[in-house]
Amino acid sequence: MRNINGEILSKNSSFEVNGKSNTLGGVLDFNSKNEKLNATLKNIDIQELSTMMNYPKFFDAKANLTFDYDSLLKKGNFNGNLLNGHFIENSFTTLFNQLSKEDLTKEVFETFDINSKIDDRILTSNLNMKSQNTQISIEDSILNLEKNLIDSKINAKIKDNSFAIALSGEALNPKISIDLKDLIKEKIIKQLEKKKKKIRKIA
């Protein structure tokens, strides 16, 4: 983070800090008043953010983020909107590509919204992503930052293929399980449709 420009205000028992800084390829604005912190990050680089947080790079995009937190209650909200991004090749995209027979890294996501509730060191998140051919959603994903544990179910659809991927255990190296019921069901339906067409031609 580069130099922060701002001001410090102190009156009676109230203490307030306002600041602005160029960071992560974008701009940080924040206000901290007593136990409450409000911050916005505009047009930041997600790859730079991943590096700063010591997480593997998995997505390339610019993002607008808001963060509200009460340090006394240890509760807050984190919301983000990523702009026209795409996945970087990783273990998740490799698995996704094997299941869907499509290349996820070539999909450009016009919509990528994430909303998280913070309760002490636990984040509960919902995520929605959409591109021309792909839709990915996550509901009530749990990330325990203190224990570095994750419990999440990813619902994915690319073109006519649907499946679910569950992540559990260590956040940086989670156990992965796959629910292929919808994918198998769709393949069976396609096979039945092909057989129906052949029967019609013979008839």
Where are these regions (language model features)?
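Exposed regions on extracellular, virion, or secretory-pathway luminal proteins
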Residues: 1-2
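Short, low-complexity, Pro/Ser/Thr/Gly-rich segments in the mature regions of secreted, periplasmic
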Residues: 192-203
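Small-residue helix/turn framework positions
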Residues: 5-189
